């Protein structure tokens, strides 16, 4: 069982960041978002940040963090084949031009766990997909990840 499956899911709070070992995902703008801007982002109701962390010998280590926001999928901007795919799970009486979605706005994996075989980014995306499709029955996820591909793989 990998480190991701041994970790704890939590809100990303100032107290958690202050009590944890230094967390960096290797991108200064993304690190700054998680340490500074994410709290204003949440208080303005733009999105909520979460993390997974492990506790070892009284130290906390954040292994990854992400931010989700409410979003919409505007089907009138999609090609017909994609439009049909988006609406196929919705009864025809409820089909519309706009569907609610969840936006993954920021996602970062601790540099210590990038490209180490643990596949933290993949596990995290699988968790988010499960969280919003199985638990809350939200239909679609909209992914707008603002980072380099090597960070999430």
Regions found by a protein language model. Name each.
Residues 1-116, 123-149:
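Non-catalytic substrate-recognition and accessory regions of acyl/acetyltransferase enzymes
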């Amino acid at each position: 069982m990998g480190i991701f499956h041994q970790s704890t899911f939590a809100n990303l709070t100032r107290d958690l960041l202050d009590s944890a070992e230094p967390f960096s995902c290797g991108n200064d703008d993304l690190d700054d978002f998680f340490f500074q801007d994410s709290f204003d982002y949440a208080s303005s109701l733009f999105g909520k940040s979460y993390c997974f962390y492990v506790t070892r010998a009284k130290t906390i280590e954040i292994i990854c963090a992400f931010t989700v926001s409410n979003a919409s999928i505007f089907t009138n901007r999609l090609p017909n084949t994609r439009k049909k795919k988006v609406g196929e799970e919705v009864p025809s009486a409820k089909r519309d031009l706009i569907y609610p979605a969840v936006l993954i706005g920021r996602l970062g994996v601790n540099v210590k766990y990038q490209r180490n075989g643990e596949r933290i980014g993949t596990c995290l995306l699988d968790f988010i997909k499960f969280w919003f499709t199985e638990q809350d029955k939200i239909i679609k996820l909209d992914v707008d990840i603002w980072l380099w591909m090597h960070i999430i793989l």
